[in-house]
Structure formats: structure tokens, C-alpha cells
Amino acid sequence: MANVIWRGPVHLAQPDSRTLKTGASILPGLAVTVTAGVFQLAATSKVDYFIMHNRAYIGETVDTAVPSGETGEAFKPVPQYEFNVRFAAATYAPGAVLSIASGQLKAAVTGEVAVAVFDEAASRAISANGLGDVRILANSYVVPA
């Protein structure tokens, strides 16, 4: 299901979402936050974040960015739900703990806030802004030394 952002089964309710204008061109699957009433890329995972959704209702795919100044929709992450998100370039192993940097999920390091885990069956190299599955953690935490 690489063509969707929320990867839940049909028997679960779709996560709550927020609809706002974007302050920049934003690809679906990137982590965003609300700043001055518009969606902006989440700089870190130390913020209240959302996951940008594709505008399927007008026929756009996960590869179509929401242009700056246009209305976009973003999901509020739900613990244990799976999302298809954008990653920083690296190789990720199943269960790898992830944080946010510039809207992308990346391997969390000491002192960062962990928000999700890599939830694919095997390790995989992902290019910058490539999509991959994550499971949202029930409780975020600061990665210890």
C-alpha cells in the first residue's frame, strides 16, 4: 500500500486530521507542525506534530507535494497506528527507534525524542524523502546515552 499515508486496516477509524494552508511546498508523509496558523515542516520531534496526507480527494498521489499557500490535510499520529512516512537517507533495521529532523524521520540518537519505530519486515536502505512504514510509539521518550 505505498499509495497511502495512513496504513491502518478498514476496521479501525482513520486518525483525526487537521486542515490548514501550508507555509511551504510539503510532500505527503513528512512530519509537520502548526506555526502561525499554517503547516510547516517539523524541525524536531520535540513539537506537537502531524503527518501530511496526500490530497486524494482531488486525485493527488503521495508523490505530489501540497504547494505553498494551498490547503493541506495532516493526520494526528495515534499510538500503535502505522503510517507511511518520509525518511532521511540511511539504512533502517526493523524496530529502529526514530525521531524527526526537518520533517523526515531518522534514526534517533542520544538526547532526541523518539516518536516511532521502523516497522518493516527487513532492513532496507531508503533514499532521502523515500517512504517507509513506521509504528507510532505509545509514549515518546528522550533517547538515553
Model-derived features: positions:
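Surface-exposed, low-hydrophobicity beta-strand/loop segments enriched in small/polar/acidic residues
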Residues: 1-145
